[in-house]
Swiss-Prot record:
InterPro entries cross-referenced by the UniProt entry: Glutathione-S-Trfase_C-like, Glutathione-S-Trfase_C_sf, Glutathione_S-Trfase, Glutathione_S-Trfase_N, Thioredoxin-like_sf
Provenance organism: Rhizobium leguminosarum
SS bonds (residue pairs): none
Domain of life: Bacteria
Domain GST C-terminal positions: 85-203
Descriptive protein name: Protein GstA
Keyword Transferase: yes
Length: 203
């Protein structure tokens, strides 16, 4: 099983983290984004969208971080990470949508400005980041994880860009429930961190 990734991609980190938490064998293949390797013909055969991550499971190719999380949970029968019960499954889908929406256009976008020089309005993306952080803070409340006492792929989908939000000049110090939640994820057996850059508030 190969995971095509880049160490500064939070989307790729989601897949890397979940593979490590599952404890299954895998090989990391770094894609040189700066050199445009993700737009090269060979890579576009794997993912026509030209994005990481991509999982190649002995010829079964899965692109998109959320799709990879779902695939791995189903492949290994890990109903603890992705419950089959209808309400829990729907709640997880909600958070996967948040990861692709509010997280992508909030803390992820804010970090893209500082780390990669992306052309976003800084004030707007930081404001979006704080809106979703406040929502996650309220949703967590006294819960250990997003759905309750145990981590699910919902937590994995949100972790990376929230953990590294300070790199995008997003101050997370006021979100105590979020910070405690991050620490719980980081304490899970098999945890692997998302590479940090000394930029923004993380400098």
């Amino acid at each position: 099983m190969k995971l095509y990734h880049h160490p500064l991609s939070g989307h790729a980190h989601r897949a890397h983290l979940f593979l490590s938490l599952l404890g299954v064998p895998y090989e990391l293949v770094e894609v040189d984004l700066a050199a445009g390797a993700h737009k090269a013909p060979d890579f576009l055969k794997l993912n026509p969208f030209g994005q990481v991550p991509v999982l190649d499971d002995n010829g079964t190719v899965i692109a998109d971080s959320s799709a990879i999380l779902v695939y791995l949970a189903r492949k290994y029968g890990r109903t603890d990470w992705l419950p089959e019960e209808a309400v829990a499954a729907a709640r997880i889908q909600k958070w996967l949508s948040v990861a692709a929406g509010e997280i992508a256009y909030g803390p992820c976008a804010a970090r893209l400005v500082t780390v990669f020089g992306a052309d976003f309005r800084t004030d707007e993306v930081i404001a979006r980041a704080h809106r979703i952080l406040a929502l996650v803070e309220a949703e967590l409340g006294a819960r250990r994880f997003l759905l309750g006492d145990n981590a699910t792929i919902a937590d994995i989908a949100l972790y990376s860009y929230i953990a590294n939000a300070p790199e995008g000049n997003v101050d997370t110090s006021a979100y105590q429930a979020v910070r405690a939640w991050l620490a719980r994820i980081e304490a899970l057996p098999g945890f692997v961190g998302f590479r940090r850059t000394k930029i923004g508030l993380a400098a």
